[in-house]
């Protein structure tokens, strides 16, 4: 878990106003430090933002007796050849972005949102057994595409984490009930071609015994907020079977409006962020 952010700037000047912006964007769970020397940096549970090229930074860390393998750092105004996977062009990013960078660098699943009752995060391959249990409660639901056999699903999940989460920074996420800690469903954002254009589609499913508690609505509300505030998405679609009345009612409750219909296919609903 990210607990500390160190802004270690050596070659450029950062005004106090910029540092104050970072402080304003953090929350009470994350501390901000402005070290004068690399010796002052504790790499455990920390993200370092620095203008020092990666190779040079790791050499400095090793010279101080620190393990450079523990370094989780993002470049600030660094060049593509400086080695960092993530580069911050500005320091006024929100805490969600810093947590995302830290998750990518550590390989931990990124927590997308936390609501009153739910926690929504990226999935890992370790979640597959629980995910199969969720889908087993929905085997008779014709609106849901079932998972592959385990070996194929495992390979699919590995590629999904790398190519969907890693490239688009969104996808289908896992939904956990906070009070029990149990996996109760999936919800998130997928890509779909509509009118020849790649658009974003919201998707959701809830474990059978956890339905009718308002969890799908709560999860989708949080996802729409994240899509607007963190991803800058301006519109979202929902593709709903004509006979899927619960899903249609949920979409309309969320603010989706009918966009297009076909004679023999699903209906298309659209949400425009105001």
Model-derived features: positions:
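Asp-based, Mg2+/Mn2+-dependent phosphohydrolase catalytic module
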Residues: 1-113
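GNAT-family acyltransferases
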Residues: 4-8, 21-24, 89-209, 226, ...
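Short, high-confidence coil segments that cap the C-terminus of an alpha-helix
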Residues: 43-45, 170, 233
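Conserved SAM-binding loop
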Residues: 48-50, 120, 240
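Conserved beta-strand-loop-alpha-helix junction that forms the acyl-donor binding cleft
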Residues: 52-54, 238-248
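Conserved acetyl-CoA-binding loop of GNAT-fold acetyltransferases
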Residues: 64-67, 252-262
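Conserved acetyl-CoA-binding loop-helix of GNAT-fold acetyltransferases
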Residues: 204-206, 212-229, 245-253
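Conserved GNAT acetyl-CoA-binding A-motif
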Residues: 230-239
């Amino acid at each position: 878990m990210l607990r500390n952010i160190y802004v270690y700037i050596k070659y450029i000047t950062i005004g106090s106003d910029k540092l104050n912006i970072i402080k304003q964007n953090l929350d009470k769970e994350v501390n901000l430090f402005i070290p004068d020397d690399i010796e002052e940096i504790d790499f455990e549970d920390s993200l370092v933002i620095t203008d020092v090229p990666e190779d040079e930074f790791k050499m400095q860390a090793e010279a101080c007796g620190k393990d450079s393998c523990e370094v989780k750092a993002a470049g600030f105004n660094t060049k593509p050849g400086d080695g960092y996977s993530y580069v911050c062009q500005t320091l006024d990013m929100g805490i969600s972005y810093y947590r995302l960078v830290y998750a990518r660098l550590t390989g931990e699943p990124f927590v997308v949102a936390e609501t009153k009752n739910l926690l929504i995060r990226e999935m890992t391959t370790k979640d597959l057994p629980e995910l199969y249990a969720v889908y087993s409660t929905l085997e008779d639901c014709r609106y849901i595409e079932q998972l592959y056999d385990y070996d194929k699903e495992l390979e699919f999940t590995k590629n999904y984490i790398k190519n969907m989460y890693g490239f688009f920074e969104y996808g289908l996420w896992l939904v956990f009930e906070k009070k029990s800690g149990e996996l109760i469903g999936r919800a998130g954002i997928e890509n779909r071609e509509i009118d020849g254009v790649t658009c974003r589609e919201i998707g959701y499913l809830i474990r059978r015994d956890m339905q009718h508690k308002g969890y799908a609505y709560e999860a989708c509300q949080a996802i729409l907020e994240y899509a607007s505030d963190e991803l800058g998405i301006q519109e979202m679609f929902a593709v709903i079977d004509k006979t899927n009345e619960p899903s249609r009612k949920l979409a309309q409750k969320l603010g989706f409006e009918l966009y297009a219909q076909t004679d023999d296919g699903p209906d298309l609903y659209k949400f425009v962020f105001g």
